[in-house]
């Protein structure tokens, strides 16, 4: 497990996270865009891939999210995350800005918060 991964997310919830990314009306893709969204406080949920190399690219994101009070979670594959974000390449991280279905995202965030404890 990568240094920056603070908790394990079950495959079922990882699939829900990828579905939420695919359904979201507005997202930010990549470590730089996600970092800006978190710093500005506009991210509703941050999803980070576990297989990012070098790890330093996204290692700051969990700490930044905790500092700003923004929920975050992990998915196993940057390829899957990129595909869910509508890219043909991998994505190290994605921030959901406008969720589309707010109630569905709220339930997903609650599941993620339970995992963190």
UniProtKB/Swiss-Prot annotation:
One of its GO terms (molecular function) is box C/D sno(s)RNA binding. Belongs to the eukaryotic ribosomal protein eL8 family. One of its GO terms (biological process) is tRNA 5'-leader removal. It comes from Methanocaldococcus jannaschii (strain ATCC 43067 / DSM 2661 / JAL-1 / JCM 10045 / NBRC 100440) (Methanococcus jannaschii). Disulfide bonds: none annotated. It is found in: Cytoplasm. Keywords: Cytoplasm, Ribonucleoprotein, Ribosomal protein, RNA-binding, rRNA-binding, tRNA processing. GO terms for cellular component: box C/D methylation guide snoRNP complex; cytoplasm; ribosome. SUPFAM superfamilies: L30e-like. PROSITE patterns: RIBOSOMAL_L7AE. The gene is rpl7ae. Part of the 50S ribosomal subunit. Probably part of the RNase P complex. Multifunctional RNA-binding protein that recognizes the K-turn motif in ribosomal RNA, the RNA component of RNase P, box H/ACA, box C/D and box C'/D' sRNAs. Its main location: cytoplasm. This is Large ribosomal subunit protein eL8.
